[in-house]
Amino acid sequence: MKSGAEPRTSLFVRGGALFDRVDYRLIETPEDKDCLYLMRYRAYLHGGLILPSESQRVSDRYDDAPNAWTFGIYVDGELCSSLRVHVLTPEWRMSYATELFGDILHPRLDQGEIFIDPARFVAEPEKAQRFPDLPYLTVRLGYLACEHFNADTGLALVRAEHQAFYRRVFLNETIAEPRSFPNVTKKVALMASDFRTVRETVLARFPIMRSSAFERRMLFKRDRHSFHEAVISTFEPASIIPSS
């Protein structure tokens, strides 16, 4: 679906010039998944994160996790980047964040916290150079998920060279030192921010992060399994989603 920040952003703010050319689409068909896995391979190989492989594809067991939404970000109809958004709840904990940093996250989940874990952020190397604001429009999906699911905390697994970006945009802080990520040559640290505390500051600094309730519903509502209904039921008392 077309991105729908509200109000419309100026061309002079981050992401504004690209905003009206972007579509967010769930990656669901075998053809779309293959294109995504190939793009991941090219991006990771270009970034020195993996060695060449015969398959030229990168996928993992969490791609079809019931608590994950995998989006493609399309500019003028072309797949340019992707983000997989995990919703972590006491009942649903499947992600690399809990696999790598379970000693930190599981006790908090046991206390009832809700996390949004944006993972597998990749961009087509040529498109990343062509569209310097593409990262902002990609990570925006994680921010919208925090709003939609009434999350307590936004997470990020981040390599050292990208930590400054997450501090600047989402006011994230490092809460765990780098650990090895499966099948990748560089370690990742665990970063986090309290969503309700930073929300207004982020919106003021980056208006591109604004959204409508309609946009969030269109992005995260799906019928192929019961997870969405279970999550919305859990959050219903504080939800921003109108009841039908």
Which residue stretches match the model-derived regions?
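Acyl-donor binding region in acyl/amide transferases
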Residues: 95-193, 197
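Short, His- and charge-rich active-site/binding loops that engage polyanionic ligands
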Residues: 75-107
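Short acidic N-proximal helix/loop "leader" segments that mark the beginning
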Residues: 1-19, 236-244
